[in-house]
């Protein structure tokens, strides 16, 4: 059955009176057709329907099982990884899939992370509740990495010639457009110049001090697109742009590229992921922070996965993730301090991501988009319970967001200028839409006339100068995302949408018959989204009959070890490192090289800043890894080898919270600390409140993550010297 659409005209209503002047809104629905009203420059409400796996044009496929991992006691990290590597060695079928790894019922203990780094691999549980991956240890990374290789190669850069490209446009004029062809992969980059920053009031946030203000190049947006049509210099793309390109504020560019290392068509489904933690500390943070991290990947999915105890995110889509679907997922009982960069439960920094039918408890930012997420990104039919912070964009300029039938329990939905918060986030979004949402308060402000944020058919307390319509009223269609998708594909999508049934016919004066019927309904427990998700049946096969067991497949030895006995002997040899007369020697030979002093204060997370960052061992940015973020230790060791650095001069952070970089000697109002975090060698107590708003340190408790990083670095450096 097609999603119901009935005639509406969005207008501005208020309790007790109707405004006496006419106001035109940007969307009308009549005779089952959506009509978008463009402004005088051609800007209109975005088409969000290209979000998700394969731009939501296909259902998520059922991939055949090719290897089975039976339950076994002990550490299962290597067994599961070996099964994934086995599937990676298989030839893809015509659809690009190699096959699925089927995990048995039971609790699989893991000491390390699981990595999917080859296209066409699915990790599948036999039972969503009974197939459990339990991550142990003090590592704060992800339990599962769905991650390709960042080997993006820009081949050509073409100037955008169009003077103005409106919001939602897919066609633009470029220099030498004839050099392009249908199917080419391109990126469109919009610059962020000084004049544009000043026009938004984001150069200075107060105090006459510009340190936290946006700087030129900080907010460049880059959209990843495919060429659909070329007509002379006119190029048509497969998905709309979420912000207008205005030549008055700088020249945009179209880049052609090749990205061989990016993976695609991978999935994680039908299981429960749990982060183990120290039960003596209810706010323990020396455990796994992220359930699933998706990076350098497109057209992938996560579905029917439960998450428990993660301090950071259940799922985070990194800025190099695109066309990702996360659906029918539940996150409960997060374990962490209550503070900044924690409990960002369903979080995207990428584009064309779709989170649908997701449920989160006790998150701080349950449904969130991060720094310069280019969009569009959509959250459809998502609920939170006991939220501890707002949902929306939680950093700077994440544009083209849709919150469609989203309920935030006990906190806000926010589109606004965050000012200096989040290390100078400023305007958090533009051209975004709240559609039939509920929250404690909905904040909907607009940064500019051609960067309008809107809220239609929402229930809450309200604030903001964005575009509002039918507040505290139900509107149709029930889901704008699926109405747009049906219109674009010209077919019904009700089965895929699985919209939770709700009676939206409200009246304060029902007839006697209606009142009696409503009284009968009141005896039935209300169907919640959590139960609606739980009732969804998993379609793909979970039968292990006839599927190879990983324990019956011979393990392949690496070529280096198989062909070189001297290498094996070398790995078993422990070099003798001594200090003689103040000189460092290894096996009697003088070690020579430079030194590197770790950064131990200051830092930002903007892309421009990261390019200039220096390697660190105990710098921590939740959910994000790389230079200037949470450094991967092997990358630090490689840096030392390349630069002929012998000594890494380690020091703990001068202070933990980047708010302290202002040198103000004040107690902070809350625990919304700013990253990157330079860790201290001692752990938190979980008790009391320190001046930065987190719990006080326990000087008798070592910071297990801090010391494990130093140990791992020492071991890795030792291996590199052999």
Label each PLM-derived region with a short phrase.
Residues 7, 12, 21-281, 455-559:
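Extracellular "leader-to-stem" segments immediately downstream of a signal peptide or signal-anchor
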Residues 23, 529-639:
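Mature N-terminal, pre-catalytic/accessory segment of carbohydrate-active enzymes
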Residues 92-93, 112-113, 132-136, 236, ...:
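Short glycine/acidic-rich loop motifs that flank beta-strands on beta-rich extracellular proteins
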Residues 120, 129, 192-224, 228-229, 264-354, 367, ...:
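Right-handed parallel beta-helix
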Residues 600-617, 660-708:
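Aromatic- and acidic-residue-enriched carbohydrate-binding clefts of CAZyme catalytic domains
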Residues 631-656:
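Catalytic domains of carbohydrate-active enzymes, especially glycoside hydrolases
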Residues 712-719:
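Conserved small/polar residues in nucleotide/adenosyl-binding loops
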């Amino acid at each position: 059955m097609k999603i119901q659409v009935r005639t509406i005209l969005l207008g501005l209503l208020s309790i007790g009176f109707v405004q006496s002047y006419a106001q035109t809104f940007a969307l009308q629905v009549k005779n089952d057709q959506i009509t978008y009203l463009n402004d005088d420059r051609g800007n209109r409400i975005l088409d969000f329907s290209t979000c998700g796996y394969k731009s939501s044009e296909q259902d998520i496929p059922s991939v055949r099982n090719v290897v089975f991992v039976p339950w076994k006691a002990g550490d299962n990290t290597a067994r599961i990884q070996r099964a994934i590597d086995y599937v990676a060695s298989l030839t893809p079928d015509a659809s690009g899939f190699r096959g699925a790894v089927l995990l048995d019922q039971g609790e699989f203990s893991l000491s390390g992370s699981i990595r999917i780094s080859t296209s066409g691999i699915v990790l599948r549980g036999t039972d969503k509740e009974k197939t459990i991956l339990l991550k142990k240890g003090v590592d704060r990374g992800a339990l599962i990495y769905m991650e390709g290789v960042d080997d993006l190669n820009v081949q050509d850069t073409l100037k955008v010639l169009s003077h103005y490209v409106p919001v939602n446009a897919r066609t633009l004029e470029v220099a030498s457009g004839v050099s392009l062809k249908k199917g080419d992969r391109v990126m469109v980059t919009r610059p962020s110049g000084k004049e544009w920053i000043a026009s938004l009031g984001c150069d200075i946030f107060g105090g006459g001090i510009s340190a936290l203000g946006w700087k030129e190049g900080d907010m460049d947006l880059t959209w990843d697109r495919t060429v659909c049509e070329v007509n002379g210099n006119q190029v048509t793309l497969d998905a709309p742009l979420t912000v207008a390109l205005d030549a008055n504020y700088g020249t945009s560019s179209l880049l052609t590229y090749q990205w061989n290392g990016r993976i695609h068509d991978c999935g994680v489904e039908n299981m429960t992921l749990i982060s183990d933690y120290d039960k003596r500390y209810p706010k323990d943070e020396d455990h796994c922070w992220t359930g699933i991290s998706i990076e350098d990947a497109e057209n992938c999915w996560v579905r029917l996965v439960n998450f428990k105890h993660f301090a950071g995110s259940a799922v985070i889509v990194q800025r190099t993730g695109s066309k990702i679907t996360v659906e029918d997922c539940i996150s409960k009982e997060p374990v962490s301090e209550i503070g900044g960069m924690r409990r960002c439960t369903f979080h995207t920094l990428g584009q064309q991501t779709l989170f649908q039918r997701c449920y989160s408890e006790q998150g701080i930012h349950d449904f969130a988009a991060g720094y310069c997420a280019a969009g569009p990104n959509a959250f459809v039919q998502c609920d939170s319970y006991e939220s501890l912070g707002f949902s929306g964009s939680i950093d700077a300029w994440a544009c083209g967001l849709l919150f469609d039938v989203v309920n935030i329990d006990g906190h806000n939905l926010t589109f606004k200028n965050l000012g200096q918060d989040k290390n100078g986030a400023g305007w958090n979004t533009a051209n975004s839409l709240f559609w039939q949402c509920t929250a404690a308060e909905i904040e909907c402000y607009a940064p500019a006339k051609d960067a309008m944020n809107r809220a239609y058919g929402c229930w809450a307390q309200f604030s903001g100068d964005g575009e509002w319509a039918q507040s505290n009223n139900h509107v149709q269609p029930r889901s704008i995302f699926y109405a747009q998708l049906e219109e674009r594909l010209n077919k019904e999508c009700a089965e895929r949408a699985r919209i939770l049934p709700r009676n939206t016919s409200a009246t304060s004066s029902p007839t006697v018959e209606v009142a009696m019927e409503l009284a009968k309904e009141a005896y039935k427990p209300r169907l919640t989204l959590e139960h609606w998700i739980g009732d969804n049946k998993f379609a793909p096969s979970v039968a292990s009959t006839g599927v190879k067991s990983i324990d019956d497949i011979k393990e392949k030895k690496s070529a280096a070890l198989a062909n070189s006995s001297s290498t094996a002997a070398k790995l078993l040899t422990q070099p003798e490192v001594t200090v003689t007369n103040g000189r460092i020697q290894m096996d009697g030979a003088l070690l020579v090289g430079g030194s590197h002093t770790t950064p131990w204060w200051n830092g930002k997370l903007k892309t421009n800043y990261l390019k200039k960052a220096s390697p660190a061992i105990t710098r921590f940015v939740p959910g994000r890894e790389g230079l200037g973020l949470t450094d991967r230790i092997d990358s630090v060791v490689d840096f030392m080898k390349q630069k002929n650095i012998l000594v890494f001069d380690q020091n703990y952070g001068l202070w933990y919270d980047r708010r302290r970089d202002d040198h103000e000697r004040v107690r902070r109002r809350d625990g919304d600390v700013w990253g990157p975090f330079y860790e201290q060698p001692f752990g938190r107590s979980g008790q009391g409140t320190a001046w930065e708003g987190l719990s006080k340190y326990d000087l008798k408790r070592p910071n297990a993550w801090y010391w494990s990083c130093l140990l791992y670095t020492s071991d890795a450096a030792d291996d590199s010297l052999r």
